[in-house]
């Protein structure tokens, strides 16, 4: 058996190396596209949607000010509260008005007038709850199903279960991903090829005063091109490295880490052609840019993310996650929540409109969520504390009943009391909509089968269309 040094010597001389590299390239390309881990797989049953666009609101938006109308909270404004960690704060009725929208009559705050026009396409999940009211643990739980251990993210599980529809692009993309938090987009013990491809940059959105705002990034492509080597030399270099990787894989038989490296390197090379063109939005019409709120003030950053999400979905990417930060309003709720809602309202509305007019919404599951909600009582002069006991997320598009308000919190919006949906149930439902049985989507690691929902999870069948 050749060792690494022998293989290096045998393949590094002149014409022999180039011929060897060409053959290795043909074999690698055929394997990566025909039977590699990213090759499209059959779902467990007929899917209701083909792809997911996950709108991640980092910092925990206030559900009682945006989507969960509580007239009793307004009536009891200023009365002593009985909820939360301090259990002594005064109840704080929402300072914003709610109205019913669409034929369904869904209640949505005046903070989100554009999203409200899509009420009949939205399924509100008012009975959400999660384990802990701490940002890092709750965000990890929302992404991976575990607050304590490093596990694959929901995007990685989705790609592992279904593969991709475009072998020249990542099957899982994270746009505007904040610095750090790699496990939110990671593959953990799954092969590395299933981790999310993160696109970020150096620009910060102005405003905000906490870590959830400061780390938000505008999408860009890091290191997509090699300025020192032309394409032919890059290909030759890559083929040689891949030959070493394949030799190692042949010796070790089962080495998912090596398999992931092989696939990732091939994908990275192919992306040099496809990705820059996909992320170039200069060819979009003025009407489309305006639809997403691009060029109209504070919406540019998230508007571009939403537009790119549509382009990635259109190109066959299976799971796209968008990040928007600075929802942690312990103070200055009145000004900051209004600003954050203004930043997402038109872009999300534009995304829904654009998908619908392209006949893509019926095959795309849109998921909007923060890691938990906020308390019905105030904190300080003008803020709300963390609340994991009850909050709202919503879904729209393929597989869900539009215009439905599912579940409920108590009269003040503190605790889920009807249609309760834990994060495990939420994950099980998303996978079900994609045609995946959360109990059958497993991966053997360290002597046991793991899954996204661990030993929990029940599909919320009442919301399925």
Could you say what each language-model-derived stretch is?
Residues 1-465:
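Ligand-binding pockets and gating/stacking loops
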């Amino acid at each position: 058996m050749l060792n690494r040094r022998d293989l290096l010597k045998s393949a590094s001389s002149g014409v022999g190396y180039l011929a060897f590299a060409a053959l290795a390239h043909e074999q690698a390309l055929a394997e990566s596209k025909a039977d590699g881990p990213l090759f499209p797989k059959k779902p467990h049953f007929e899917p209701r949607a083909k792809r997911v666009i996950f709108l991640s609101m980092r910092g925990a938006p206030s559900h009682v000010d945006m989507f969960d109308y509580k007239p009793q909270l307004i009536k009891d404004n200023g009365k002593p509260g009985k909820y939360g960690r301090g259990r002594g704060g005064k109840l704080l009725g929402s300072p914003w008005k709610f109205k019913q929208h669409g034929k369904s009559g869904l209640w949505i705050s005046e903070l989100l007038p554009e999203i409200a026009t899509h009420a009949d396409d939205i399924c509100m999940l008012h009975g959400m709850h999660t384990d802990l009211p701490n940002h890092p643990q709750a965000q990890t739980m929302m992404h991976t199903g575990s607050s304590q251990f490093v596990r694959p993210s929901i995007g990685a599980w989705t790609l592992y279960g279904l593969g991709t529809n475009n072998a020249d692009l990542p099957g899982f993309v994270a746009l505007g991903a904040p610095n750090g938090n790699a496990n939110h987009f990671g593959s953990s013990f799954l092969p590395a090829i299933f981790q999310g491809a993160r696109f970020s940059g150096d620009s910060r959105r102005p405003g905000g005063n906490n870590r959830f705002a400061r780390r938000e990034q505008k999408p860009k492509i890091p290191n997509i091109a090699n300025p020192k080597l032309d394409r032919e030399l890059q290909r030759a270099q890559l083929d040689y490295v891949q030959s070493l990787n394949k030799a190692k894989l042949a010796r070790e038989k089962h080495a998912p880490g090596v398999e992931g490296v092989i696939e990732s390197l091939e994908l990275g090379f192919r992306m040099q052609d496809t990705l820059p063109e996909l992320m170039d939005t200069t060819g979009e019409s003025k009407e489309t840019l305006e639809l997403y709120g691009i060029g109209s003030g504070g919406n540019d950053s998230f508007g571009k993310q939403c537009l790119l999400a549509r382009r990635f979905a259109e190109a066959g990417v299976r799971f796209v996650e968008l990040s928007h930060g600075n929802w942690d309003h312990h103070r200055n709720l009145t000004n900051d929540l209004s600003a954050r809602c203004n930043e997402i309202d038109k872009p999300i509305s534009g995304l829904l409109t654009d998908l619908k007019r392209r006949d893509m919404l019926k095959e795309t599951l849109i998921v909007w969520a923060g890691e938990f909600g906020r308390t019905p009582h105030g904190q300080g002069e003008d803020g709300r504390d963390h609340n994991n006991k009850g909050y709202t997320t919503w879904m729209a598009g393929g597989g869900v009943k539009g215009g439905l308000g599912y579940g409920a919190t108590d009269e003040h919006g503190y605790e889920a009391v009807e249609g309760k949906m834990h994060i495990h149930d939420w994950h099980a439902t998303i996978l079900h909509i994609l045609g995946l049985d959360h109990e059958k989507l497993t991966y053997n690691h360290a002597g046991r089968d793991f899954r996204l929902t661990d030993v929990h999870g029940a599909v919320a069948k009442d919301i399925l269309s």
